[in-house]
Amino acid sequence: MVRDEDLDNLIKNLPFLIRQNINQHPSKQKLIEIVIDLGRRPEARFTTGPEYLSQKVISWQDINHFTKRISKFSNDNRAGIERTLHRISCIRNRQFLINGLTCRIGRAIFGTISSVRDLLESQQSILLLGKPGVGKTTIIREIARVLSDEMEKRVVIVDTSNEIAGDSDIPHSAIGRARRMQVATTDLQHQIMIEAVENHMPQVIVIDEIGTELEALAARTIAEKGVQLVGTTHGNCLENLIKNPPLSDLIGGIQSVTLSDDEAKRRGTQKSIIERKAYPAFQIAIEINTENSWTIHEDIKSSIDLLLRKSFTGTQVRELFLDKRTFIKYKKLQIDTFTLLKDSNSLKIQTINRSNNWFTRSQKSLFYFQNSKAKKCFIFIYSLPSNLISEILNKLKFQYVLTKELQKSSLIVGSKVSLNQNFKLKKLAQQCSIPVYSVNKENIYQIISLVKLFK
């Protein structure tokens, strides 16, 4: 990874005592932000922890010295330094006078997205989730550069606070060939998003910090027009978006549905349930846990549906090491049994993620996979002729072992009617995280199509 920090352009504008101490500090390159509050000692926050920069407290003169050397603060109390990525935010008193400053270091880090480059090449819309300060803006800046320079796409950035491309009319070189549209006030971000699509023919729209209902609706409108979206929002995981009413439209929105008595009994749930309302604006979600560890949801639609049914989703965790190796770890997949009790046509979509089934995980790949100890598939057959299934599996040269112990099985195969009636089997399958496959009839053609799904 290559870093471009422009730290000197920020430090030279600070008061003398702060400037001197930072320049002499051994952890200068690990600086995250500088906090300047009236009547308090200046504080520097590093990746290793906070430290005071001076024994002297900050005065009005120190604050005025700094604010005169930066750009004017906008309506969201943010400012910057010309041709840099640093952000300065202010705190005001009741008379609207500045009595506190937060100087956040902006860094262009090249090579941060090498572990998810395959997701960018899929041309699907990507949503990045993370806590404040985890590095979402740095990542989205690098995504814009890779899409515009290396993949040669028409990229337009909607830069609300001038954080992505810097505080200048000339965009920072870190965004490559991507174009940047500035926003006069934060209230107009959703209008600029629509304007970018209508006026500038982009293939990709990059948006930082989607935070209001209007912006979420604008994102959905852009997605319906066939433009690839790359956006960020605050939140630890997808569940936070479900519980956040203004942002739930990003993942399709949620609604309360009342089921009939028969349907509720078939599903084994209560009559009033929560379901996804529409298609999500984004197809892929990336949860940024730490700087080098990200959780990937390759199909947001399926993940949201399973979360609403209180089931675990099949996700992957990607870790990037210093030697540029990517380690991919698949989490265990646990799905409610009723979602699997579909006919064999819809089963291909409803059940297991293609990259999470046991067969794929047992193959050799460019990456490292966990949960791949079993080289043979242990099949538990319920209310179907085992001789017929064995014959089909042998003809298809499928490595398998028929087992009568449910807890040792890799998957369960049975008839739809019998599985619907056996609630105990459903519960055990859910507790043991065992996927369930079903067929409507004991038909050789249905069983063959079902077995082909295992591959």
Curated annotation (Swiss-Prot):
Location, primary (coarse class): plastid
Binding-site positions, ATP: G130, K131, P132, G133, V134, G135, K136, T137
Keyword Nucleotide-binding appears in the UniProt entry: yes
Domain of life: Eukaryota
CDD domains: AAA
Name the UniProt record assigns to this protein: Uncharacterized protein ycf45
Keyword Transcription: no
Species annotation: Trieres chinensis
MF-aspect GO terms: ATP binding; ATP hydrolysis activity
Annotated Pfam families: Spore_III_AA
Gene Ontology CC terms, in alphabetical order: chloroplast
Locations listed in the record: Plastid, Chloroplast
Family, similarity comment: Belongs to the ycf45 family.
Gene name tied to this protein: ycf45
Keywords, sorted A to Z: ATP-binding, Chloroplast, Nucleotide-binding, Plastid
